[in-house]
UniProtKB/Swiss-Prot annotation:
Family that this chain belongs to: Belongs to the FAM229 family.
Coiled-coil residue spans: none
Protein name per its UniProtKB record: Protein FAM229B
Pfam families: UPF0731 (PF14982)
TM regions (residue ranges): none
Region of interest (Disordered), residue spans: 1-44
Domain of life the protein comes from: Eukaryota
Species, as recorded: Homo sapiens (Human)
């Protein structure tokens, strides 16, 4: 029997905070992955192809504090 691509949903390892809820009967894997996955601790969103897992509702200050400051040139560090 030849293998048919897309006949079974792909499985990804469960990480901390990910939902452990299985698919409801009659719900396809693509319908479950589109939109939001709800978790008791955070909201997760998958892209339409189920390649990305994004944490939503993260404050902008989190991104601002995790960015590295721009490198200073030698002129700025040692003004004449």
């Amino acid at each position: 029997m030849p293998f048919q691509f897309g006949t079974q949903p792909r499985r990804f390892p469960v990480e901390g905070g990910d939902s452990s809820i299985e698919l409801e009967p009659g719900l396809s894997s693509s319908a479950a992955c589109n939109g939001k996955e709800m978790s008791p601790t955070r909201q997760l969103r998958r892209c339409p192809g189920s390649h990305c897992l994004t944490i939503t509702d993260v404050p902008v200050t989190v991104y601002a504090t995790t960015r590295k400051p721009p490198a200073q040139s030698s002129k700025e560090m040692h003004p004449k």
